[in-house]
Structure formats: structure tokens, C-alpha cells
């Protein structure tokens, strides 16, 4: 069932709720809706259980879409919470460029003794910064450097 046909062409929903950003898989009509939050709001959920995050997400969607929470629950098939703030390996993990980022990126993109290579969204210099696409492009660059050094 298409829950909100009038929103099918929506890519992003930006709200003034605790979880302020939502995006779809547009143009794919998969029914997947991703909520995203960062900064001080994310720190509020550092120790939250996935169920607690879901409760807040449903409240935010209820407020933004003007759909009763019970109806949202009825139509929810599954959910997953990625709590990067609580992950000891990422401790937050969203990157954005600041003054000096270009020089730092150049240094970090240089292999150490042709044996240690770095990759990730922060090392990508294109237009998709801070995304999975950026991390993937950076990884491809590192793989190409490795292949170049081993052939």
C-alpha cells in the first residue's frame, strides 16, 4: 500500500522536529524512509535503545505528516537504527570540509611507505562530500593506488 501518494516524488522532508531530516529512495519507490540527525540532537540518543529511537521517530513523523502514530505503526514493516555516535570506532562519523581541509585531504590521500592507504568520505574532494558515494569513490581511489603500486 502506498502510504502517501502525494509524497512519492519527494526526496527530502526537512522538519523542525527532534529528528529534522528524512529522505526517501526517490526515484525508486521502495517504501524506505530514512531519518537522520546529527550534532547536539544526536548526542541525546547516544545511549538510547533502538526502540527508544523508533518511538521518537514515530512522534516526529506524526507531527510532520499529520498522521496518527498508530497508523504509522500499522504500516511499519521493519526498522533499523544506526547509532554512529555510540559506535566506538566512528564516534559520530559525519565529515564536512573546513578551512584547511583541502591540504589535510591531500596529506591523508598520500600512502605511507606505499603500504598504508586511507579512504573514506572525508578524503573525497568531489561534490558528494559526506556521503556513502564519497566513501566509495575514495575507496576506489585507494584501490587504484594499491593496484598501481603492486603491478
Task: Provide a role label for each language-model segment.
Residues 2-151:
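Conserved flavin/dinucleotide-binding core of flavoenzymes
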Amino acid at each position: 500500500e502506498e502510504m502517501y501518494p502525494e509524497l512519492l516524488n519527494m526526496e527530502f522532508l526537512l522538519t523542525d522536529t527532534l529528528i529534522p531530516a528524512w529522505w526517501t529512495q526517490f526515484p525508486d519507490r521502495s517504501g524506505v524512509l530514512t531519518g537522520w540527525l546529527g550534532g547536539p540532537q544526536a548526542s541525546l540518543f547516544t545511549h538510547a535503545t533502538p526502540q527508544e529511537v523508533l518511538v521518537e521517530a514515530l512522534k516526529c513523523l506524526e507531527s510532520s505528516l499529520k498522521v496518527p502514530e498508530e497508523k504509522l505503526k500499522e504500516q511499519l514493516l521493519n526498522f533499523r537504527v544506526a547509532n554512529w555516535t555510540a559506535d566506538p570506532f566512528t564516534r559520530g562519523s559525519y565529515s564536512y570540509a573546513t578551512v584547511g581541509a583541502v591540504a589535510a585531504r591531500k596529506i591523508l590521500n598520500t600512502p605511507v611507505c606505499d603500504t598504508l592507504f586511507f579512504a573514506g568520505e572525508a578524503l573525497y574532494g568531489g561534490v558528494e562530500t559526506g556521503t556513502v558515494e564519497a566513501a566509495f569513490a575514495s575507496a576506489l581511489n585507494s584501490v587504484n593506488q594499491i593496484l598501481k603500486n603492486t603491478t
